[in-house]
Amino acid sequence: MSVAACAPSGDGNAGRHKAAPPIRFDSIGIASTEGDCANADSACARVNILYPLAESETHHVAADAIHQTVAEWLLGRPGDDTRSASPDTVAAQFIAAFLDFRRANPTRTPRWTLTRAVRVVVDTLGVVTLHGVQEDYEGGAHGMTNTFWASFALATGKRVDVNDLVAPADTGRFRAIVEREFRKRRVFPASVSLADSGFFAETGGRFALPANMGITRHGLTLHYNPYEVAAYAAGPTSLTLPWPTVQDLLRPDGPAAAFAK
């Protein structure tokens, strides 16, 4: 059984004199189950997908960039170049794979789950920030969870990267601050090699910034997913830099400047 729902995130009864938001978000939900999911001892597959659909009459470039990023998170997986055609296809393919497994293993009672959830966590001061989660379990020793962050500047329409946040001359100082916080989170003293600790092997132990960065009201959130900079057993690493920590490095005309005031 599959259920899809669409509900606008804004106030549909707002007064006609109220200015329309730069980007309007509708929440789309897809839920699908297969098997006897009410019985914990029975085979079951569950799919839950929730994401925002961005629309705008004035900020088309930003809305398109947001749409592309949401699609990337919903339809693919990190390290896998294949991509499903649509969220409905993601659900259908997962259920089909579950049924194939059941036919090949009729005596087993697998419990499979797939979750794709994307939320708008910031929509103010000319910035939209998305937070996304992928969770997959298809049996085995463990499932897989990936977390995503991305911010978009409405003024340019582009996804924000480190060069939008700090000037090139300050990138080294910014990276040093992030590394310091990373080491605190991982309890690695400055004297300990990251490579010897099992991190950043692909860069020879040299610290690197993550692809996932998000502007929030409280600070800049950065996230490293499993396998991104270490083995799966090391788990993910997430940290938030309070704005006072990096305020002196921020571009005064950049998308994060207004949040740090």
Question: Predicted regions: what is each one?
Answer:
Residues 7-261:
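Compositionally biased intrinsically disordered regions enriched in Thr/Gly
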